[in-house]
Amino acid sequence: MGQDDAATSPASLPAEAMVRELWDRQQISDVMLRFGRGLDLHDWEMYAATLTDPFEVDFFDLTGRPPAVTTPKVWAQFASACLERLVVMHQYSNFHISLHGDQADGVFYHISRHRLPNRFGDDHYTQYGWYENSFRRTADGWKISRLKHTFQWCDGNPTLIDVSDPAWQEAAAAVFGPA
């Protein structure tokens, strides 16, 4: 049991505080599930609604670029440039959430599957890893305030996410600055 876990053990919390903690954890879990569902449906409005404005993003493993601060709208345009032409499915597991009042941190394991039938190689690209996110309670509920995507490994055809596409280049530059 880590320090965060010990601080919120059932014996140390009154019933009302336990219910509040469980509610907050469920709301944060729901944010992550909407985040993934928005990606899978290519519902960029749903996806953007899971993020604070502005928020910090670290997608170094995908982009090779340093962390940046951006807006949900600009980030959703980047996600669309990466994924719009693909069939995708994001699965999350092993949720670990640490609450700190109106702030929270969480680690969420993911398997992200990407598929595009093509003539140039494998039709799939799968990423295995986790998100290390921070969250903030807002007037609209919990939202992601820091998004960090870490790959443990990948398999398949990484060129399905076409970083040479001018739309991808433009969207990446809007988030991270020029390459």
Q: Can you name each region flagged by the protein language model?
A:
Residues 10, 17, 29, 60-61, ...:
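Generic, low-specificity signal for short hydrophobic/alpha-helical stretches with a mild N-terminal bias
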Residues 18, 22, 65, 69, ...:
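Charge-dense, low-complexity intrinsically disordered segments
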Residues 1-49, 53:
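Short, low-complexity N-terminal intrinsically disordered segments enriched in polar/charged residues
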Residues 23-26, 79-83, 176:
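Generic secondary-structure transition motif, activating predominantly at the C-termini of alpha-helices
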Residues 2-16, 84-179:
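A beta-strand edge to alpha-helix "cap/lid" segment located at domain peripheries
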Residues 44-112:
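A solvent-exposed, acidic/Ser-Thr-rich amphipathic alpha-helical stretch
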